[in-house]
């Protein structure tokens, strides 16, 4: 992951990847994890996502990690929340407020506690292929025994678009999470009117996965 690339995106407010509302995939498929309020939730590379609010309405503890300090501060400021901020190192800060615990810094070194449920909408697809194996190793290490992941990926011809977001095809998903129970919940194929197809992609699909340890 090119950290400078993402830092510049947030600094210049070029954040087309940020959705102004809850992702409909989350509201439709979260129930597939059989979640309970007491179960803890982790959202990697969370940005200032509205999905965090949706999850906090249903869970007592929602944690996240985000590279950009700008994004983390914006998350709390836009909601008029005043978090407790703890400096853990020169490159890592912890923001605490009610249900929310968000680390601003490197995903690979943030001390995330083991969690029951993970929601990954925009993290895996933000990473180039050479980083995805290490990313998933860390993700799996943070999932409790019996834990579950709701994963959203994209499938398109990587030769036709450089990314991010990157294509993570089914065979790679199954390889990365081998040894776990993997269920494809949905494949949403873009039609001819989709912006990506209009820009020249021959196919573009969003896939939703339920993964159990």
From Swiss-Prot:
This is Thiopurine S-methyltransferase. GO terms for biological process: methylation; response to metal ion. It comes from Aliivibrio salmonicida (strain LFI1238) (Vibrio salmonicida (strain LFI1238)). Keywords: Cytoplasm, Methyltransferase, S-adenosyl-L-methionine, Transferase. The keyword Methyltransferase applies. Its EC number is 2.1.1.67. GO terms for molecular function: thiopurine S-methyltransferase activity. It is an enzyme of class 2 (transferase). It is found in: Cytoplasm. Belongs to the class I-like SAM-binding methyltransferase superfamily. TPMT family.
């Amino acid at each position: 992951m090119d950290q400078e690339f993402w830092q510049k995106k947030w600094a210049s407010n070029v954040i087309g990847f940020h959705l102004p509302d809850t992702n409909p995939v989350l509201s439709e498929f979260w129930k597939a994890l059989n979640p309970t309020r007491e179960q803890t939730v982790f959202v990697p590379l969370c940005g200032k996502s509205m999905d965090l609010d949706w999850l906090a309405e249903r869970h007592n503890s929602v944690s996240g990690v985000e590279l950009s300090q700008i994004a983390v501060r914006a998350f709390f400021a836009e909601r008029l929340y005043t978090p407790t901020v703890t400096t853990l190192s020169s490159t890592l800060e912890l923001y605490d407020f009610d249900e929310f615990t968000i680390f601003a810094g490197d995903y690979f070194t943030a001390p995330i506690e083991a969690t029951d449920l993970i929601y990954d909408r925009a993290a895996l697809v933000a990473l180039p292929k050479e980083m995805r194996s290490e990313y998933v190793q860390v993700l799996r290490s943070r999932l409790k025994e019996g834990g579950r992941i709701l994963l959203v990926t994209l499938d398109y011809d990587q030769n036709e678009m450089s990314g991010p977001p990157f294509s993570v095809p089914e065979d790679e998903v199954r390889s990365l999470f081998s040894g776990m129970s993997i269920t494809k919940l949905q494949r949403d194929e873009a039609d001819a009117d989709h912006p990506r197809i209009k820009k020249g992609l021959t196919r573009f699909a969003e896939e939703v996965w339920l993964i159990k340890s």
